[in-house]
């Protein structure tokens, strides 16, 4: 019988529900249990694919091509599992499905309502994930904050699941904030009490309360929360700000959170073997070297827009015993005139993915600087496309060379629409998405990084390198080092006469893990260290 854990949040959003859920998943997996995890987002968008990064942070892509919430990246990195489209559910998806069923006549002429039709669809998404994975435990994080009107159908659905599968098979975890009032020198539990009161008014009694705090939570305070929220003091779990996120599972284990969960769910499992994880955390806290990477993007004011890229850099750093210092460089402020001054202290330059024409020339200036000055360069998606544009302009001498995405009327469309994209009108869900194979050319930097000639990586793009320019590029020193297996689509380019200049069309950051860094990131950081 599958067991169900639901993680809700109160007081404020962005208090670490995703990290809590992912950390618990790691502990349970290390106890020998099979775990899957999903995120319910109450917004009406079908997915975050067309949302601004300023609104949502990065869009995380799964193997099967789902454009999902960035929390799925935390889940995959912590638990080391590959999720799918059933792991991210939005109000938009649910309502779309219910309306489709109504139009098809599935409801036999009945009045379609939030209860039971929307709530049943939500429950089905939980049960479907359980059926598909046959997991011992499924963890479901409910986005937003208790009290939000958008969350009500989700909370009602998870309330009903307890009745559907039995109380012994369901556990509710509520994550709240205990604010520290500096002027008074006190921490306040009242917001937590009110948040739990709101949750209980909806029919959900939390079994565990995780309190986010900057200061230590005293036993007296835990007793007070337990009294007012009708749980044991041992079921109040402190979640402090950590030096590294990867210490959170160890902190939860120290407070026996996994034991409490298994006791509630009437499960028996051996203690979690966390030696490898402890070694990872020890390594992270005791890195002996430093390397500075200039990350050049247009969304750098919200670093969550590049969350997986930053994490993949850090993972590579762990492998090299190096702390990664990321210099967040706004490409809108980079020009040919000031690029040397901006880049003077960086050991490597990375241009990540992106869309649209804003701040493109700043990225191209950064790429030219890396190429000319032999600074290690790593381009991802748009970062690859602009590397070929820069090379076409400044090495091949093709005046006005550009991407058709940015300049549709260019005489030299180095980057053009994929043929299958030319008649597509809708933006959402229509990119080339998900895991695709790439064949790597022998004797290249890409092959040296991967140690193999066939890899699979996750993609998210609509435009592709124009093969009309391939021969000309290669003759001038920018070679195609990986393509799709049929040789049609360019996947990786690199410079022959450069210490490390590699750019890929796919998004390698999505498969990086803290204890298993992605190969190109690992090689790039190694090259940056040599450049110090």
From Swiss-Prot:
Catalytic residues, chain numbering: 381, 507, 509
Protein name as catalogued: CTP synthase
Residues that coordinate or bind ATP: 14-19, 71
GO biological process: 'de novo' CTP biosynthetic process; CTP biosynthetic process; pyrimidine nucleobase biosynthetic process
Assembly description: Homotetramer.
Domain Glutamine amidotransferase type-1: 292-532
InterPro entries for the chain: Class_I_gatase-like, CTP_synthase, CTP_synthase_N, GATASE, GATase1_CTP_Synthase, P-loop_NTPase
Disulfide bonds: none
Record entry for activity regulation: Allosterically activated by GTP, when glutamine is the substrate; GTP has no effect on the reaction when ammonia is the substrate. The allosteric effector GTP functions by stabilizing the protein conformation that binds the tetrahedral intermediate(s) formed during glutamine hydrolysis. Inhibited by the product CTP, via allosteric rather than competitive inhibition.
Catalyzed reactions: UTP + L-glutamine + ATP + H2O = CTP + L-glutamate + ADP + phosphate + 2 H(+); L-glutamine + H2O = L-glutamate + NH4(+); UTP + NH4(+) + ATP = CTP + ADP + phosphate + 2 H(+)
Residues reported in the UniProt entry to bind Mg(2+): 71, 141
Keyword Ligase listed: yes
Organism: Listeria monocytogenes serovar 1/2a (strain ATCC BAA-679 / EGD-e)
UniProt function note: Catalyzes the ATP-dependent amination of UTP to CTP with either L-glutamine or ammonia as the source of nitrogen. Regulates intracellular CTP levels through interactions with the four ribonucleotide triphosphates.
Residues the entry annotates as binding UTP: 13, 188-193, 224
């Amino acid at each position: 019988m599958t067991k169900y854990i639901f993680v809700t949040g109160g007081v404020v959003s962005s208090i670490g529900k995703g990290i809590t859920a992912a950390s618990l998943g790691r502990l349970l997996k290390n106890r020998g249990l099979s775990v899957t995890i999903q995120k319910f987002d109450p917004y009406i968008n079908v997915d975050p694919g067309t949302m601004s990064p300023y609104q949502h942070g990065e869009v995380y892509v799964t193997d099967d091509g789902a454009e999902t919430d960035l929390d799925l990246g935390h889940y995959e990195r912590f638990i080391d599992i590959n999720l799918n489209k059933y792991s991210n559910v939005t109000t938009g998806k649910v309502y779309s499905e219910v309306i489709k069923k109504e139009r098809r006549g599935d409801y036999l002429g009945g009045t379609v309502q939030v209860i039971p039709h929307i709530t049943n669809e939500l429950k089905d998404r939980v049960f479907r994930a359980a059926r598909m994975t046959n997991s011992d435990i499924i963890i479901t994080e409910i986005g937003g904050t208790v009290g939000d009107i958008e969350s009500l159908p989700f909370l009602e659905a998870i309330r009903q699941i307890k009745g559907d599968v039995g109380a012994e098979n369901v556990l509710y975890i509520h994550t709240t904030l205990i604010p520290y009032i500096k002027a008074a020198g006190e921490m306040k539990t009242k917001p937590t009490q009110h948040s739990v009161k709101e949750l209980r008014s909806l029919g959900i009694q939390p079994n565990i309360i995780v309190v986010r705090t900057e200061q230590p939570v005293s036993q007296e305070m835990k007793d007070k929360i337990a009294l007012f929220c009708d749980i044991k003091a041992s079921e109040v779990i402190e979640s402090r700000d950590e030096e590294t996120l990867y210490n959170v599972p160890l902190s939860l284990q120290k407070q026996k959170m996994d034991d409490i969960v298994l006791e509630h769910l009437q499960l028996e499992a051996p203690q979690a073997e966390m030696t490898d994880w402890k070694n990872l955390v020890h390594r992270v806290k005791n890195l002996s070297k430093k390397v500075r990477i200039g990350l050049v993007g247009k969304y750098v004011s919200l670093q969550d827009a590049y969350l997986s890229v930053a994490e993949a850099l850090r993972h590579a750093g762990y492998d090299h015993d190096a702390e990664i210092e990321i210099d967040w460089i706004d490409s809108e402020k980079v020009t040919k005139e000031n690029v040397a001054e901006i880049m003077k202290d960086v050991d490597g330059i990375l241009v990540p993915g992106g869309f649209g024409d804003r701040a493109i020339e700043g990225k191209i200036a950064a790429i030219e600087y890396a190429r000319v000055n032999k600074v290690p360069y790593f381009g991802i998606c748009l970062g690859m496309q602009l590397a070929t544009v820069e090379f076409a302009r400044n090495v091949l001498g093709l005046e006005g060379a550009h991407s058709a995405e940015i300049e549709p009327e260019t005489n030299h469309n180095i980057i053009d629409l994929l043929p299958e994209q030319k008649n597509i009108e809708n933006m959402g869900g229509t990119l080339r998405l998900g895991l695709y194979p790439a064949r790597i050319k022998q004797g290249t930097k890409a092959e040296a990084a991967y140690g193999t000639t066939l890899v699979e990586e996750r993609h998210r793009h609509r435009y592709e390198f124009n093969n009309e320019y391939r021969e000309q590029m290669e003759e001038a020193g920018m070679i195609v080092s990986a393509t799709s297996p049929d040789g049609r689509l360019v996947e990786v380019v690199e410079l022959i006469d450069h210490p490390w200049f590699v750019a890929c069309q796919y998004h390698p950051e999505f498969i990086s893990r803290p204890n298993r860094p992605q190969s190109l990131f690992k090689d790039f950081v190694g090259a940056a260290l040599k450049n110090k």
